[in-house]
Amino acid sequence: AAPERRVVLAALGPKMLALSAAHADGALPYNVTPEHTARARGIVGPGKAIYVEQKICLTEDAAVAREVAAKQLAMYLVLPNYRNCWLRLGFTEEDLSGQGSDRFLDAMVAWGSEATIRARLQAHFDAGADHVAIQPFDPAGGTSPDWNALAVFAPGD
């Protein structure tokens, strides 16, 4: 038998989330917080899948983590769909100005100890996510994924 295949919509706002509930197998929100995941679950309902993405940076140095976060989020800060989503989540224009406030950067990129990052991933599951995809940023600022973080959070076999 053929494997089950699901088609989900990339969805941030309430209209796209409702569309994903009505016409797809679920939603894939990107650049979101666990609070957004809870809102998304409320809109798409219990019978649809929610696959979220969470950026991570395995470092306990706040300055390093925020520098990496600011670099990685810069291209999204100018896009209206993401800005509107973040404003709906309670961020302010001030939070989204420049490279983003510490509050914004900390909300978008989980950083800290392994336990701290695992708690953020769990917060998405607790909020209704079916799957959480991690995007591990290199604390050294490299363009490749942080292979150490992958070994910790997605060890495979």
Name the predicted role of every residue range.
Residues 1-157:
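Active-site-adjacent structural elements that line small-molecule/cofactor binding pockets in enzymes
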